[in-house]
C-alpha cells in the first residue's frame, strides 16, 4: 500500500459522508470520508467497524449516550451495535471494517 494522507484524500472527495475505499489489509477494508456538521440516522452492521478520527471530531450516539471521538482517537463499534452520528461532527474519518 502506498503512503496515504487521509486528510488530503478526504478533502478531495466530492461529497461528505460518502466513504471511498483506499486499501485493504487481509479481510479489512480501509475507507476514508469527510465529515460535516450533519447528523445521520442510527445504523448497525454485521461486522466490526473501527472509527478513527484523524482530524476534527466525531460525535456518536450509542446506547443512549454521547461519545466524542477526537483526532488521534478510535472507537470500535462491535457488530450489531446500533450507532448514530450526532450533529457537530467534522473533519476526517477513517473507517476500518472487518
Stretches with model-predicted labels:
Residues 79-98:
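Ligand-binding loop in jelly-roll beta-barrel domains
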Residues 29-45:
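Conserved short histidine dyad/triad with adjacent acidic residue
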Residues 26, 54-55, 70-71, 89:
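A cytosolic small-molecule/anion-sensing beta-strand core signal
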Residues 1-33:
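A short, N-terminal "cap"/entry segment at the start of jelly-roll beta-barrel domains
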Residues 37, 47-59, 63:
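Glycine- and acidic-residue-biased ligand/ion/polar-headgroup-sensing regions
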Residues 18, 28, 36, 65, ...:
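A generic "binding-loop/recognition-motif" signal
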Residues 64-80:
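Short acidic-glycine-tyrosine-enriched beta hairpin
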Amino acid at each position: 500500500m502506498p503512503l496515504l494522507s487521509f486528510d488530503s484524500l478526504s478533502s478531495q472527495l466530492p461529497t461528505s459522508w460518502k466513504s471511498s475505499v483506499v486499501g485493504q489489509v487481509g479481510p479489512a477494508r480501509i475507507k476514508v470520508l469527510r465529515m460535516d456538521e450533519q447528523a445521520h440516522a442510527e445504523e448497525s452492521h454485521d461486522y466490526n467497524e473501527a472509527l478513527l478520527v484523524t482530524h476534527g471530531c466525531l460525535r456518536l450516539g450509542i446506547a443512549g449516550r454521547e461519545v466524542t471521538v477526537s483526532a488521534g482517537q478510535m472507537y470500535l463499534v462491535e457488530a450489531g451495535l446500533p450507532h448514530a452520528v450526532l450533529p457537530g461532527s467534522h473533519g476526517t474519518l477513517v473507517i476500518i471494517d472487518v
